[in-house]
Amino acid sequence: MSIVQNKKAFHDYFIEEKYEAGIVLEGWEVKAIRAGRAQLKEAYILIRKGELFLIGSHISPLATASTHVNPDPVKTRKLLLHASQIRELIGKVERAGYTLIPLDMHYKSGRIKLEIGLARGKKQYDKRETEKRKEWERDKQRLLRIRRSSD
């Protein structure tokens, strides 16, 4: 079940591969995510010292968050993957034009997981072409519905 999706990612990037990663969270963050107070819109993933980190994601603390914990909504969060997957991703990201971006936050067996994508940036003309293709698919479906209802 999806909690948060990064719809902008599919508009701005070609997604080549998808991976599922665990994410290191504190208790107040888990509660806030369960309440639907998370955003991935401006988030991206950096590689530091052979580890992956989620940067720029926003998790708004609940009003009932503990007073002895100082919540930071945009802190850097570590991602958990197998070492072989991390090495593979590092090798692919070092190629020109590739980056890692968060696509989706979801539950799996009671845990919160992050789906990340190996992505290549779209140029402006690619974005326009994708938009035209989507628009044509919508028009085609609309025409088929009209045709079926008139029969």
Curated annotation (Swiss-Prot):
Any GO BP annotation: trans-translation
Compartments, as annotated in UniProt: Cytoplasm
Keyword Cytoplasm applies: yes
GO molecular function, one term: RNA binding
Alphabetic keyword roster: Cytoplasm, RNA-binding
InterPro entries in the record: SmpB, SsrA-bd_prot, SsrA-bd_prot_CS
Superkingdom as given in the UniProt entry: Bacteria
Cytoplasm as UniProt keyword: yes
Main location: cytoplasm
Coiled coil: none
An annotated GO cellular component: cytosol
Protein family: Belongs to the SmpB family.
Task of the protein: Required for rescue of stalled ribosomes mediated by trans-translation. Binds to transfer-messenger RNA (tmRNA), required for stable association of tmRNA with ribosomes. tmRNA and SmpB together mimic tRNA shape, replacing the anticodon stem-loop with SmpB. tmRNA is encoded by the ssrA gene; the 2 termini fold to resemble tRNA(Ala) and it encodes a 'tag peptide', a short internal open reading frame. During trans-translation Ala-aminoacylated tmRNA acts like a tRNA, entering the A-site of stalled ribosomes, displacing the stalled mRNA.
Protein name per the record: SsrA-binding protein
This protein's encoding gene: smpB
